[in-house]
Amino acid sequence: MNKVLYALLTLAAFTSCANSFNIQGTSNVSSLDGRKLYLKTAQGDSLVNLDSCDVVHGQFAFHGTIDSVEVAQVFMDDVNLQFPVVIEKGDITVRLDNTQQRVSGTPLNEKLNDFWTKFTQLRNQYAEIDHEESAAILNGHDEETVNAQLIKKALGVYAKGDKLFTKFVTENFDNILGPWCFMTRITYDTTPNAYPVWMNDYMYANAINQLPSWVEYIMTKATDSFKQNPQVKAFYADFLQAQKEMNGTAEPAAEAVPAAGTTPDAVAAPPTPAQMAGDSISR
């Protein structure tokens, strides 16, 4: 009996080790020192703490075990630091700075870091366009003419984002990053007042108009495992219902588009272009 019990305990310990994650973090943001950080993931419409820690002299760490690979976010109290991390077994390294954020150490986190860096660069371009508009108006240029020219520039940034999302989702259909990126774009594109005021109405309408065809394109290309992801499956069912309602072929049902910040795994809407001019994780 003792031998059987010992064997079971050994197996349990081995399994726990095999599914454990270890996140070592550093930060040079002075306002984070002494603060408590939380690693949170979404379960349904709720956020669940995976672990928490204090930042001490710019150092922090998260540890735990997982049943399956998922995407989590780092919070300072209730403030989402807009820093996604893939929770998978292995040693993960994160760096939180005002100017740069990086996650590395495991295969999926390397992929995520590459995508998030490019996505952040595109978001910054909206802020740059906003600054360009303000400078032009201050210099006496006609506001309507300036805005018309810069809207075209903003649409070019949106087109680059469309290609970035499409490429990343299709390259990651069969791991957690595909569904996560798919739902992240939906959350981002359906967030009202996401752009600087002078371009918001036009850019938001453009995003909403483009989204249905993008969703259909992704779903026609998607693998079975992607389609069976619970979040994707639930969203797409609501999306199809909403499309039928718009065409007058179905009774009204739940809205297809989730509210910003409620999308599973995305956890919260990414920082919007309207926030980027002074955006920093120290706020």
Language-model regions, residue ranges each:
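A detector of low-complexity, intrinsically disordered, Ser/Thr/Gly/Pro/Ala-rich segments
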Residues: L8, A13, F115, A260-G261, ...
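Extended amphipathic alpha-helical interaction segments
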Residues: A154-T170, D174
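A non-transmembrane, solvent-exposed segment enriched in polar/low-complexity residues
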Residues: C17-G156, D162
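Charged, long alpha-helical assembly modules
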Residues: T170-F173, L177-R283
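Bacterial Sec-dependent N-terminal signal peptides
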Residues: M1-V29, S282
